[in-house]
Amino acid sequence: MVLSDILFSIYEHREKSPVFSWFAYLLRILDWIIQFLSFGLIPSIGGDLYDLVDNGLFKFVLDRNIQKKQNQLYDKFRLGTVKMCLVFDGELTKKLLLDNSIRRGGLYNLLTKFFGKGIFTSNIHSRWMKQRKAIFKLFSPQNLIQITPELTTSMFEELDRLITIKKDLDLVTVLSLIGLVGFCKVIFGVDVTDMSEELIEPLNDLLIYINGAVEPVLITADPSYRRFITNKKFVHNWMRKLIDKARKSENCFEIMRQQLDDIGSDDETELIEFILSVVLGGHETTARLMLGIIYSVCHNKEIIEKLNNETDEYPKGDYINLKKRPYLNNIIKEGTRLFPPVWLLSREAKNDTTIDNHFFKKGTQFLISPLIILRDYNVWGSNAEKFDPERFSNMDPKSKASKLYIPFIVGSEDCPGKKFAILESAIVVSKLFKEYEITVLKHKLNPMSAGTFRLSDKLPVSIKKLKN
């Protein structure tokens, strides 16, 4: 498959990923009985919940986007008693995100059951704003300049180790590992090489379970829930070890050390939940972004040639020179457009709200998908699903596409880690294609979601380091 010749459409490759829910199963039986006895005159209790359960969240959302009417801005539906609104239109999305009366809501309460008070995954709590400001400060340009050399070295030392000891490489796992090792080294001052691999599978299983969790009440007897608890305990213990090592490290970033001290040992669980959230935001989302970029670039020799020629022009891989590189930055922009780190988020109307003559009742739960907006043919043209870095070369800043390029969200809850994600992606993409030969082996893509958008759950590759 050559991506320069065909478009890779997530819509054509979307697959069912059914969710088993005891609640939905029992409710469906009750619904069937009521429908039978009432001759279908009483509305379904579950609403569209069964469609969500049968197809999985990813296909459910994409199907509704495909089925929308021309010029339809949003789709209101119901999951049980919860009123939902899936937004299709980019301009409306941006206005919702910028509206101070539209904030995190009920769906984040569900996430909090699983992740606790993580900054990226919980509802807003007492320390949330202070932690958010700390993350922004942590990833300031001045700090990114400082960490770039060590981040580069640690990630590629880990890559060299992996291609030496492993015969069969999975690019998904490789990117997760090098990102995790690099992130923990520069942020916490901790070398996690000897413990990184043990985290990947239970953390991944944790995310997959949460992605399919639709139970309003946790059913603790469910075997899948028990597996979730086992994985959660393991992941929390891993974070506990990381925290202990960070406290002893002389190289832990001072901003992060202050956060460790601020939460302290009095609430160990909250501290672990915060660190887990930071680690997830620092390596998991970026690894998924890099997967999409590397896969796309691998299939286009022209892009590789242009990229490597530019690398020759900017041989220094420091932060300043990476920022100066127009073609590399266009590759990263195109990657974040097609593979946004967070593909779906929720917001809640805290009051009755009217936006552009569209009325939304208090309590409405909005589903907002950057993935839909950033692949909208009405915004990005007929090649919206093609990987084409050139589209950013001469983009008019006043154009609709420029205004709706929001891969990291906008407003009061925009992504505090976006600068780090861009930096890490730029480092890996630039160095990987210049100093290594990477070949994608026989595979089948299966786009899916598990918190983040995933181009595939596995991608077999061959990676060889080139001789100088």
UniProtKB/Swiss-Prot annotation:
It comes from Acanthamoeba polyphaga mimivirus (APMV). It comes from the Viruses. It is found in: Host membrane; Virion. Its EC number is 1.14.14.-. Heme binds at residue 415. It is a multi-pass membrane protein. The chain crosses the membrane at residues 22-42, 172-192. Its cofactor is heme. Its main location: host cell. InterPro entries: Cyt_P450 (IPR001128), Cyt_P450_E_grp-IV (IPR002403), Cyt_P450_sf (IPR036396), Cytochrome_P450_Monoox (IPR050196). This is Cytochrome P450-like protein L532. Belongs to the cytochrome P450 family. One of its GO terms (cellular component) is membrane. One of its GO terms (molecular function) is heme binding. Keywords: Heme, Host membrane, Iron, Membrane, Metal-binding, Monooxygenase, Oxidoreductase, Transmembrane, Transmembrane helix, Virion.
